[in-house]
Swiss-Prot record:
Residues 1-22 form the signal peptide. GO terms for cellular component: extracellular region. The keyword RNA-binding does not apply. This is Submaxillary gland androgen-regulated protein 2, isoform beta. Pfam families: PROL5-SMR (PF15621). GO terms for biological process: response to toxic substance. May play a role in protection or detoxification. It is found in: Secreted. InterPro entries: SMR-like. Keywords: Detoxification, Secreted, Signal.
Length: 41
């Protein structure tokens, strides 16, 4: 269970990092992953 949580955290961090690189993030379509509305906290 802890492994799944770590994978989720890493996925969100990667999404946030790609959101900074708007051009590349738009190509991969991962930037919405870092939307504050999608985060539970």
């Amino acid at each position: 269970m802890k492994a799944l949580y770590m994978v989720f955290v890493l996925w969100v961090l990667i999404g946030c990092f790609l959101r900074l690189l708007k051009d590349e993030a738009t190509v991969f379509g991962l930037w919405p992953l870092c939307s504050y509305r999608m985060l539970p906290f």
